[in-house]
Amino acid sequence: MCIRDRYYDLKETDSLAHSTAVQVSREIGRRIVSGNYKPGDLIEDEVSLSERFSVSRSVVRDAVKILVGKGLLEVRRGIGTRVQERTKWGLLDNDVLAWHLSSPPDREFLRQLMEVRLIIEPKAARWACEHGRDKQLAEIEIAQTRMEEEQSSIEDFVIADALFHRAIFRASNNEIMRAMEGLIFSALLSSIRLTNKDPRKNKESILFHRKVADAIIQRDADKAEARMESLLGDAGHRLKKQINTPKK
């Protein structure tokens, strides 16, 4: 399963679109986010796109409407369909976040995602202590145990890591916080592609996660918040080293 599909799986969203228009929109969207189409570029006309994807022109029109709704495209009569500036994209949209995972790592985007995580996740850990039900806290412990069991596998460890953070978000019992979990999944899956290439280093990460889990299970909100900050500080340090490594 590719990393993009892992994102949809974590979000409990079907990565296989049932609508042909959605499938086409996702393919065009991936090309926009990956930079094949750049802001200001005109994409192909309806006829060309319908031939490329072997679909009707009405399907292409519906696909374009989907991308207009996500802020990626604009349609101008007499000019064509143009890619919008990145500042107009719906960056928190589930598909847009997933499309980033299909693209080469965007180091600036990863840096910004980590900054947001540093603001959000320590509070999520605190609220999990304060508002989480016993069953939800048990899910956090289960997820952390799974990380220990999967430490020899890069791919399985990544999923266990994401499930750990998802369990904390959901234990916060804050609807707004839960609505932002897609952002965290994208940040996790994107950054881990760079920082978690050697399974032998998973042991270092497990210790940070174990300390967070212990604090939450003990419902020690101050300690949980501080330990999550330490966990993210370590992750941010490793990510920064990768970001600052010259591209070959």
Language model features by range: what are they?
Residues 36-40, 130-135, 221, 243-247:
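Surface-exposed helix-capping loop/turn segments at secondary-structure junctions
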Residues 53, 172-173, 243:
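A broad structural signal for alpha-helix termini and local helix breaks/kinks
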Residues 4-119, 126, 246:
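Short linear motifs at protein or domain termini
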